[in-house]
Structure formats: C-alpha cells, structure tokens
Amino acid sequence: MLLLAQLPLIPQPRELASRPDLALTRGVSVAAAQPDDRFTAQDLGDALRERGLRVVPPGTPGAVSVTLARLGTPAARHALAGARATWDSAMTAEGYALVADSGRVTIVGASAAGVFYGAQTLKQLVGGSSRLHGAVIRDWPALRWRGVQDDVSRGPVPTLDYEKRQIRTIAAYKLNVFSLYFEHTLAYPADPLIAPPGGALTPDDARALVAYAARYHVTIVPEQEAFGHLHHVLKHERYAELGETPHGHVLAPGDSGSLPLIIGWFAAIDSLFPGPFVHVGADETFELGRGRTKPLVDSLGLGPVYLEFLARIATALHPAGRRLLFWGDVAVTSPDQVKALPHDLVAVAWNYWSKDGFDPLLKPFLDAGLETWVAPGVNGWNRVFPDYATALPNIQGFIAAGQRLGSTGALNTSWDDDGEALFEPNWYGVLFGAAASWQPGTADVAEFQRRFGAAFCGDTTGAVDEAERRLLAAHALLDSVGLGGATDDLFWLDPWSARGQTAAAVMRAVAPRLRLLAEDAIELVARARSTSSG
C-alpha cells in the first residue's frame, strides 16, 4: 500500500485517505445506472482494457466491482456511510467521492460531470501488477472553468482526430474548456476567401468536435479575433478597405463595413458552437490610431476609442444566454476606462512571463463588477522547446491570484506566433495548469514535477521527471547569460553576422554544460522507454 504522498495523481485530490490495495487479477466490472453515466462507464472500461486488465460483466465471481452512483441512491448512501464520508454542497456541480475498499469501488457524484471526474481519478489509481490503490477520496474543483487554448491560426493546423485526442487528454486531467484561437482558419461559407482550403476548421468539423467534446464534459469556446490580429483577412483586396491601415492587422472602428463583417462571423459561430461562451479576442490592437482613426484618437484618446468599438461589438453580438470573453489589455493601457464596458462581459487577463504582481491585471475589472478569467501561458512559442522555467511559476502565480481574487476561470494558453511550434511538448505545462486550476490555493511545482512522469507517461522510475528538470535547467542557463532561452531567433541566428558572433562568444562559455543537460534528457527518456518496454 502506497503512502498518500506517493500516489502520482494529477490534479491532487482535496482529501484522500489510504485503504488496502485491491487485486484486479480476476477482472473488473463497471456498472452505471444513470443513462448520462454510461459513456463514462464505457470510457473507464476501455481505459482498463488498455492497461491489460480484464473487464467482465457485473456479478462475475472474484472480480472487483466499480459502481458509478448518483448522490442519494442506495449505492451512494451505502458507500458514503461505510467510508464515514460526508457530502458538501461545494461538491455538487463537479465534485465526487470515491471509495475503493473491501473489494469494490463506488464513485459518487451529484452530476454526470462529477461521476466522470471520479472515473478519471480511478484510472490514475490503477498501478502495476494488476493492483488498484485503495483510497477514500472527496474532491471538487477550485475554479468553475478550467481550460486550455490552442492557437490554430499561426502554426500547424491540427487534424480533427488530433483535436479529439487533445479533448480526451485534457478531460482526463479534469479540464473542461478547450478554446480554439481563430484569425482566419474557421471556414465561413459567406466569406470563402478567408480560410485556406485544407487548413481550416469546416462547419462539419466544428459540429463533430462540439459533439465529441460534450461526451467528455468539455466545452468548446471559439475565439474569433474581432478587432486586431486580422491581417490574413485584411490582406485580401475585398476586405482591405476595412483596415485601420492598408492591408494591416486592425479593423477600422469607423468603417461602416467593420461591424457587419463581425456580426456575420459570429452568427455562423452561434450556429456551430452552442456553449455558454464565445471569445471576441480584441487584444494587441497596436495600429489603432495610426491610420484612419488617428483624428478620432487624437481627439478622444486611444482608450475611449478602443472601448467604444468593443462595446459596440458586445452590443451587436449579445447572444441570448451566452457570455462574451475578451482579452483584458485595457486593464494595462486604460484602467480608468474599464467601467465604461458592459458589465456582462468576461475579461480574460493575460500574462505569460511574470510569477507575481498580477493584481493590477484583475482589479480594474473586478472593481467595475466584471467577471474575470486568468490566462497564463505554457511558453512554448518562438522556442525550440517550451521554457518551463518561466511557464511553471507564471501558471502557478497567476492562477493562485485568480483564485484569491475571485476569478471564475483559467485559460492556459498555447500560442504559435512563430509558425513553428508543435503542441506535443506543451503537455507538461497544460497538466500543471490543470492541477493549478482544480486544486485550491497555490499549486506546488515540485510536487507536480515529481508526479508528471508517472501520471502522464506511465514512467514510475522518475526518469521522465528528471529529463524535464534538465530541460528547465537548460533554459535557465541560457537566460542566465542573456541569451533569452532556447528561442527560434537564437536557433536561426546567422553565426557569421555581427550579432551571431557576439552570441557565439557568450554561448561558447556555457555550451558544454548546455549540451550535457540536453544529452542527459535524451538518455533519461531512453531509459524510461527501455524500462516501459521491458
């Protein structure tokens, strides 16, 4: 029987008491009485089979029975009473109780989501040698909305099958929001010029993705940039006249065609994505006031012009029963103007580099009565490999600040500014965001680093965890000598240029240590693979 601290669970449950392990050598049965829980039963059974276990019909002699029970049913009452576990009102929306003891397992939830999350924890309790770690767990999330965003406009555009795998994976670690970032890669039938053929999400793809995600209790939040970041639209002559500057990046607020274009896009989005949120972006409108609206900005100021157009967007869209998210740049640029915003907007404050000092990003919105989410980042863009030496403290600090100040959600971001980033190296940061969003208070980085390899890769040797630490150290080493981490800029820098020669002189001093860290990581991963295959 493992001690509590040795169980590699991500996220960590709020309350966990150890019980004797259960032997699974004679099979496992999974039963669900509620129709809404039958997919969870199927998903759990599939996961157990993938672990090499035998899934048998309920009532099979000697098999460990898993019962998915709703709160208030006889099975739930019996399990809670036997474990002397109580049910708190905070657990109702997504919480669960798990009792794995005396040859049986009962997962209790007041909702389908709660039962599903209990089943995800049960998957992680299955250890080697066909054993299940016995435990009594009570658990529920700190934040209502726990998400990850993937930039599908500026880097590799994922296939529908890959996005489904992303959904399955984030759901397994109790994330419930998957946000897709669109500049020009959502296909609008009314605007066929915009989306690249074969490199965009079609309406049929969107419907399939939404339906698939719903089974895993994941809400798809579409983000269509509606103000800035629109060069791939405005580069076309048909739309160029709507730009603040010729073929630029920002819509001109004063152009009579700007708002109708946005309304048309979001009418299509409204028919494809039925969830409670849509995201209008509206960040980094750097060109605003440098072109057609310069006289207006000179007269009224940049903040009022920006906020007036954002308010017009919100008023024009205002879908019944849905909330509009927007990026919270204005808290930095014009905090005194925030009170002019419609109060039903949700401000998503973002910062990808700091480890503390987040209150000024949230307070202007909270003081104005707006709901807030926080958006840290995995720091995998513009880099050969994510800079987790920066990302982990950023995710840790920002989500903890959001919890403390009353934010209702966290959206951990993965960007592709350079067009070269791949998503797979981001899972380390994504899972830490899942832990920080579900667990109350400040997530422990060291604890996460100790758990990741076993929880995500199935490596119980610690080799994967140590490999990640070596790569963190490599980034920190490059930062310490002023080279800014393993950036694409450094990778592609011409070594014969004056700047390249300067960087090379600095690099030579740390190159042996840097290469050893990378070589260590390669050897450690190879060791983990060898142990797993053996």
Locate each region found by the language model:
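Substrate-binding groove of N-acetylhexosamine-processing glycoside hydrolases
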Residues: 9-12, 16-18, 23-26, 91, ...
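Sec-dependent N-terminal signal peptides
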Residues: 1-5
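Beta-rich nucleic-acid/ligand-interaction surfaces
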Residues: 61-62, 186-189, 193-195, 335, ...
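Short strand-loop junctions, especially beta-strand C-caps/beta-turns
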Residues: 27, 33-35, 151-153, 183, ...
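Generic recognition of short, well-ordered alpha-helical segments
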Residues: 39, 43, 161-162, 359-360, ...
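Feature activates predominantly on carbohydrate-active enzymes
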Residues: 87-316, 325, 374-376, 380-382, ...
